[in-house]
Amino acid sequence: MLGRSGYRALPLGDFDRFQQSSFGFLGSQKGCLSPEPGSVGPGADAPESWPSCLCHGLVSVLGFLLLLLTFPISGWFALKIVPTYERMIVFRLGRIRNPQGPGMVLLLPFIDSFQRVDLRTRAFNVPPCKLASKDGAVLSVGADVQFRIWDPVLSVMAVKDLNTATRMTAHNAMTKALLRRPLQEIQMEKLKIGDQLLLEINDVTRAWGLEVDRVELAVEAVLQPPQDSLTVPSLDSTLQQLALHLLGGSMNSAVGRVPSPGPDTLEMINEVEPPASLAGAGAEPSPKQPVAEGLLTALQPFLSEALVSQVGACYQFNVILPSGTQSIYFLDLTTGQGRVGHGEPDGIPDVVVEMAEADLQALLSKELRPLGAYMSGRLKVKGDLAVVMKLEAVLKALK
């Protein structure tokens, strides 16, 4: 039937190209009673009646004549240059036309209004928020999202604030995905979860003319461990033995049914001497020693001249113990190979850090990052925040 009538079917893949065909300054090539190109969708305008089409044409002709009469002056305002990475969406008497550009675009004065749309890949971040995983852990997690606009008309017509709507969609999808997973799966399969979030977000944003290219999860900190997790296995291998010989029997009673350490570990515990900073405190057993003092003293073997040249700052740690008292320690990375000890530093510290003993333990075991601790309120800073961020170099030295 189509062959006899002289018409041919337009392939479905060419429909978008057909919508973006060239226009004259008076309107569409299709006719007054047909909808404007780009007006396909739930918010499309109805076809114009012949009186409306006639008025539209007369006003457009008058606008074009006014442009010609005042062209030397009006040319500066009517001619717009659109770069390759942009498209211009033009509204003529309230009706949308097809995307204009790249190149030079002519606008009719007092009739046309326009909006530029950037087609380049852009990125935004989902601010870190507190979420509860499936196993009861509380963590601070955010995301980095890269996106681009593939349909300029939909990006203008479908949603008012595209960036805010996309950010909220990504936040909701991330929340729903992480609530169904335990903490270990979130930490081990961030790339897989990011790919799933990519598909879920695109299912929503494609109708807005936007396509998400990449989603990367960023776990800032674990604010509360899982309810059924053990304390010792979650520590870094270097600090695990340190915690065992510092806490002794109290650590074993805290973890419940954890098997007792082997003979080699017991022999090592018996040979370890108390830290020098506690020599004058009497013959107290090691389980009563402050955990913070032992953890900070354990940093001494990892200090080096290279670390001093990289950091070059002096820190004072005001550690709040579980009893409510406050202990002061220092980490001097300004001269020599660096020093760490109990009490205030010899000079004025570059920054004063205040945190709880448990948070310090999580920081040195690499469960908590300085930036995540600061954003969650678990680390208070008096001084330059950039100096505190240099603690990342100290944490990297712990192997």
Curated annotation (Swiss-Prot):
Modified residues (Phosphoserine): 28
A GO term, aspect molecular function: ion channel inhibitor activity
GO cellular component, one term: membrane raft
Annotated InterPro entries: Band-7_stomatin-like, Band_7, Band_7/SPFH_dom_sf, SCP2_sterol-bd_dom, SCP2_sterol-bd_dom_sf, Stomatin_HflK_fam
Membrane topology: Single-pass type III membrane protein
Regions crossing the membrane: 58-78
Keyword Transport: yes
Tissue/organ expression: Expressed in dorsal root ganglion neurons.
Domain SCP2, residue spans: 288-399
Function: May play a role in cholesterol transfer to late endosomes. May play a role in modulating membrane acid-sensing ion channels. Can specifically inhibit proton-gated current of ASIC1 isoform 1. Can increase inactivation speed of ASIC3. May be involved in regulation of proton sensing in dorsal root ganglions.
Protein name in the entry: Stomatin-like protein 1
Lineage of producing organism: Eukaryota, Metazoa, Chordata, Craniata, Vertebrata
Chain's gene name: Stoml1
